[in-house]
Regions:
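Catalytic core of pol beta-like nucleotidyltransferases
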Residues: 1-2, 16-24, 33-154
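Short gly/ser-rich loop at a beta-strand->alpha-helix junction or flexible surface loop bordering the NTP-binding
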Residues: 6-16
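Short, conserved beta-strand segments within well-ordered enzyme catalytic domains
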Residues: 10, 30-32
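Acidic Asp/Glu-based divalent-cation binding sites
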Residues: 26-28
Length: 154
C-alpha cells in the first residue's frame, strides 16, 4: 500500500505492544501527506472503497507541558478484510501535523506493566468472553491510556 500511494505508513497502538490480540485487535496506521485529496483517491482505488467511506474528523491533542490544545483535522476509514481476519483503521493527515501526532502516539508505546495488564484484561473480557460491550471497552481503554497514564486527553 505504501508503494502504491507513494507515502510511508506509520503503525501505532497495540500492534506495537504486547496487548495486541492477532485477528481481534485492529491495526492503527497513520499516513502523512502534502496532498490529502490525491492520497485519499489512491487509497480508495487500492482498497476498493468509496469516497464516502473516508470521514473527516477532528483530533484534539492536549499537551500538559505547554498547556496548548492542538486541533488537527484528518480523514479516517476502517478497512475490514474478513478473509484474513484483519481490521485496519487508517488515518490520513497533512504532513504539517506529523511531528505532533507521532509524538502523541509515541507516548503510548511503552506502557507501564499495570496499564498493559489492565488493557489485556479488558481485551479478554471484550474479545474472548464477549461480556464487555464495545462502548464500555473503548471508553475504559481511552480513560486508562489517556488520563491514568499519560497527560494527553485526545
Amino acid at each position: 500500500m505504501s508503494n502504491y500511494i507513494g507515502e510511508p505508513i506509520y503503525f501505532f497502538g497495540s500492534i506495537q505492544r504486547c496487548d495486541y490480540f492477532p485477528g481481534l485487535s485492529d491495526i492503527d496506521i497513520d499516513i502523512f501527506t502534502f496532498d490529502e485529496k490525491t492520497t485519499l483517491m489512491k487509497l480508495q482505488k487500492f482498497l476498493d472503497m468509496d469516497k464516502s467511506d473516508f470521514k473527516k474528523f477532528v483530533y484534539k491533542i492536549d499537551k500538559i507541558d505547554n498547556k496548548i490544545n492542538e486541533v488537527v483535522i484528518g480523514y479516517k476509514t476502517k478497512y475490514i478484510d474478513t478473509e484474513n481476519s484483519l481490521t485496519v483503521e487508517i488515518s490520513v493527515f497533512n504532513e504539517k501535523y506529523k511531528e505532533v501526532i507521532l509524538n502523541e502516539h509515541k507516548s503510548k508505546f511503552d506502557l507501564p506493566f499495570y496499564i498493559t495488564w489492565f488493557l489485556m484484561f479488558l481485551k479478554v473480557l471484550h474479545y474472548n468472553l464477549g461480556i464487555l460491550p464495545i462502548y464500555y471497552y473503548s471508553l475504559i481503554k481511552k480513560i486508562i491510556t489517556n488520563k491514568f497514564y499519560d497527560y494527553n486527553k485526545s
